[in-house]
Amino acid sequence: IKDMTNRISERIAILRKTPHECYLIKSHTFVTYHDEVLPLYRGNVLYEYSPEEIKNQALAGADWTLKYQKENGQFLYYYDAQEDNYVDHEHPERPADNLYYNDLRHCGGIVTLIRAYQLTGDKKYIEGAKKGLDFSVTLTKEHDYNGKTAGYIFYNKKAKLGGTGMILVAMMKYRNETNDKSYDEYIKMY
């Protein structure tokens, strides 16, 4: 079926014409919040979206990303609804002023804002992306490589090739959109 069409509605139509057995499984999902158990009303609902609806949903995600961007340029990384806090359950011992954060996902937030700017031309997105880039610059470590200054992103006591690669992509996308040369030094270093 995957070679015939990418449209879910067409795949369903093909399946309906194909001899097979189907079973309907009914389930319920719940989440705990403080002392309450709350039902979730989500599921895989079949929807067909227009390009405009997809764009609006993407922009709503970018708006949410901006809404939860901190003054230092970081984005909200983790929220625990049960405990109503921002402490990552995999890193519960981190101090409140230094909660766990992921530089790769940070770069994803920057690229999201740049894409929103490309779709709308709204400066709020590119300004948020710049704040995110400025935070990433603070994570840059420099070293000498063959007589030249090279750089990499160092965060959470480690350097990841993907972290440096993603910030390079984000900086280049930002530069292409704004012609702002303020990150050229870092682009060359990475």
Predicted regions and their residues:
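Well-ordered alpha-helical scaffold segments within catalytic/enzyme domains
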Residues: E36-E52, C107-K123, G165-D180
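Extracytoplasmic/secreted envelope proteins and their assembly/folding machinery
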Residues: A62, I110-L113, L133, D184
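Positions within ordered alpha-helical repeat solenoids
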Residues: K67, R115, T138, E142, ...
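Long, compositionally biased, intrinsically disordered segments
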Residues: K70, A129, L133, G151, ...
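Aromatic side chains
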Residues: F75-Y77, Y117, Y125, F135, ...
